[in-house]
């Protein structure tokens, strides 16, 4: 079985390889435990009368545990080279989920419309901060795993952001986007980059695909590559905004 195969592998492995294997199996057990805990919390969680009337899909409940388990699986899949691409959507722009586990008993979509209802801003900020915390969790998890001469984080690219800029105005321009990970040393991090004119979001996607050697010349509405992403690119620093 799997246990016998892993034991045989341990016996054959060198000391450094055994350390990697131990880290892998420890991570795997952590994922198993988190999934079991998420299931248990999902069965045992109690909700108030208002939430009890909602469609189960709209109650976040143990969303935190489920998201962490998914992120752990993504990290393990990258580390073992089971896949080199993953996508994880924490919420969509029309999300009706109630983040009850954080004390927010209103729809995410409702609190995103705050121009004429400032009272919902604390709830909206809390949800956005929680989403950002999941990115931080993913990054820190990837930094703990050795990958070649660096870490898994050093050799990966993480694109994080939203498909909409402002909930009230449904703005689709100047999207908030964070690019993390070293991309194997190809990406110049620690900057806030603004472009002098609008660029299709597809240009960013195409540029990242090219950095990863993906065989593509176009994606979505792309019109070309986006300058300034790679540390090797010729990019005028006048377009950089650190404020």
Residue ranges with predicted function:
Residues 1-243:
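Ligand-binding pockets and gating/stacking loops
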């Amino acid at each position: 079985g799997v246990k016998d195969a892993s034991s045989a592998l341990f016996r054959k492995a060198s000391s450094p390889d055994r350390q990697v294997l131990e880290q892998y199996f420890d991570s795997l057990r952590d994922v198993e435990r988190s999934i079991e805990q998420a299931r248990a919390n999902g069965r045992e969680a109690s909700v108030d009368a208002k939430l009890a009337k909602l469609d189960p899909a709209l109650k976040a409940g143990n969303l935190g545990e489920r998201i962490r388990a998914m992120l752990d699986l993504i990290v393990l899949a990258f580390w073992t080279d089971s896949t080199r691409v993953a996508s994880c959507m924490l919420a969509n722009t029309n999300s009706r989920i109630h983040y009850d586990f954080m004390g927010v008993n209103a729809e995410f979509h409702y609190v995103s419309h705050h121009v004429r209802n400032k009272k919902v801003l604390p709830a909206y900020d809390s949800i956005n901060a929680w989403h950002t915390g999941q990115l931080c969790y993913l990054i820190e998890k990837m930094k703990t795993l050795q990958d070649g001469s660096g870490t898994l984080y050093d050799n990966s690219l993480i694109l994080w952001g939203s498909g909409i800029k402002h909930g009230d105005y449904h703005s689709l321009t100047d999207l908030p986007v964070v690019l993390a990970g070293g991309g194997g040393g190809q990406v110049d991090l620690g900057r806030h980059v603004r472009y002098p004119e609008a660029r299709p979001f597809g240009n960013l996607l195409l540029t990242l695909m090219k950095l990863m050697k993906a065989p593509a010349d176009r994606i979505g509405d792309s019109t070309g590559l986006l300058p300034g992403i790679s540390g090797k690119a010729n990019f005028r620093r006048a377009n950089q905004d650190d404020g």
